[in-house]
């Protein structure tokens, strides 16, 4: 046999072996062998615990014997823990947390770039509620952010805790930041900040302890409707162009809130909508991520029933990556094989 024919034969054999190896590798993930992971980054009770535990049960059913656990924490803490190998996944990744983690800004002590990756979009449905008591609105003569910035009324403003970056930098600081206004300027007006999670803020509004609340909730939220019955509310109207200029850095949406979205929304206005991402530590194996995504997308009907925010859950929806993070290799392989990305 000539040297040329030997080279061709060798190349063909190598290609065949490579294809066989790739095929064998791909098939090795389509089994029932258990996987092990922990989910970090959310509170001990509430929405994300319910979501995580439901997803974990789906994974255990798909891969009997899997060790899928839930660890209460915080969004920033979740990113830190998946980056240092203490946990595998977090479902509460937000734009500000990711930004601060990559840049090494407090509460992160160093950049975590290269230590965690994007896995999936959890949802794109968290509405930033800008609520004000009607009594204060009438007294101060303000109904919109434009009005507030123009008149600068002293008020009691309910916002989230400093440790929750996505619900501060991604909410009230984002809205006021569209006008170049931060905490220092608000303080000069005589604005007093009352900090707490959404439920605490709603309780303060119900009790008349705050005049305005800017925090995240899904639409509609039953407690907001209930508060309005005893303490009439107004929705603080947003300026579409200013909001769009502010949300771009995080890939958030500005959408129309139609008249009647809540009983007290008297005309169409605009609101910002935030997403949460499923993130994964780079120490996690390709197999674990691939099998995790396969299990939950195969059972998408179950996931969609967990909460209205997940009603659109599908492999086509969760592949959207609004961050600067790379896809984890296991996620990249899954989405390619699922036909939702090239």
Where would I find each of the regions flagged by the language model?
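Bacterial N-terminal signal peptides that target proteins for export
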Residues: 1-11
């Amino acid at each position: 046999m000539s040297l040329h024919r030997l080279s061709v034969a060798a190349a063909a054999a190598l290609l065949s072996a490579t294809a066989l190896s790739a095929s064998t590798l791909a098939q090795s993930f389509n089994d029932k062998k258990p996987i092990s992971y922990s989910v970090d980054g959310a509170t001990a009770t509430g929405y994300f615990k319910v979501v995580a535990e439901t997803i974990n049960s789906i994974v255990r059913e798909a891969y009997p014997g899997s060790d899928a656990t839930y660890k209460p924490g915080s969004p920033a803490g979740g990113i830190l823990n998946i980056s240092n190998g203490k946990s595998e996944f977090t479902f509460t990744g937000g734009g500000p947390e990711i930004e601060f983690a990559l840049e090494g800004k407090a509460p992160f002590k160093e950049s975590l770039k290269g230590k965690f990756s994007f896995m999936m979009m959890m949802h794109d449905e968290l509405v930033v509620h800008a609520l004000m008591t009607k009594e204060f609105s009438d007294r101060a003569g303000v109904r919109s952010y434009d009005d507030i910035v123009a008149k600068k009324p002293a008020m009691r403003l309910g916002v989230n805790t400093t440790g929750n970056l996505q619900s501060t930098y991604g909410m009230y600081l984002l809205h006021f930041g569209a006008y170049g206004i931060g905490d220092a300027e608000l303080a000069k007006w005589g604005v007093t900040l009352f900090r707490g999670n959404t439920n605490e803020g709603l309780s303060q509004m119900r009790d008349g302890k705050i005049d305005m609340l800017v925090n995240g909730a899904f639409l509609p939220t039953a407690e907001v409707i209930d508060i309005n019955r005893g303490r009439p509310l107004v929705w603080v109207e947003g300026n579409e162009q200013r909001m769009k200029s502010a949300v771009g850095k995080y890939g958030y949406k500005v959408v129309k809130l139609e008249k009647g979205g809540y009983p007290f929304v008297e005309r169409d206005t605009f609101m910002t909508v935030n997403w949460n991402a499923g993130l994964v530590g780079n120490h996690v194996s390709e197999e674990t991520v691939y099998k995790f995504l396969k299990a939950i997308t195969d059972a998408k009907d179950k996931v969609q029933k967990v909460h209205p925010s997940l009603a659109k859950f599908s492999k086509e929806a969760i592949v959207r990556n609004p961050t600067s993070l790379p896809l984890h290799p296991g996620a990249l392989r899954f989405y390619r094989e699922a036909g939702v990305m090239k």
